Regions:
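Conserved active-site-proximal phosphate/metal-binding subdomains
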Residues: 1-117
Length: 117
């Protein structure tokens, strides 16, 4: 579920929040982060206490979200960078390496062409 949310997200779908670790980290915006950022929310605990509270709950959220629970899907979040919107599809590591290799070959051939001119 989180991977699907990442693939659909843009940089505006992220938030810096202390809700997971007690320290600021960029995460996918979700009902979880919204609740922690609301004025009525308690202050997150300092690290390492906040993860001791948050991670068991988020593990259960992820488990329920994978099972299709709508409320859990809305709560599910994970760490991301601002470039999350650049990811548009899920590729295997092998595919990424092969594409990188082909890009290198293409660049090398273009460079070689410049040297011949």
């Amino acid at each position: 579920i989180v991977k699907e949310k990442m693939l659909q997200a843009s940089s505006s779908d992220t938030v810096r929040s202390r809700s997971r670790t007690g320290k600021h980290s960029r995460q996918l915006k979700s009902s979880w982060t919204d609740a922690w950022e609301s004025e009525s929310a308690p202050e997150p605990l300092p690290m390492p206490l906040q993860p001791m509270v948050a991670e068991p709950a988020l593990a259960k959220v992820n488990q329920l979200a994978e099972g299709g629970h709508d409320g859990a899907v809305n709560l599910a979040t994970y760490w991301v960078g601002q470039g999350v919107g650049l990811m548009t599809e899920s590729l295997s590591a092998g595919t990424v390496v092969q594409e990188f290799k082909q890009d290198f070959i293409n660049a090398y051939e273009r460079f070689e062409g410049f040297l011949k001119d």
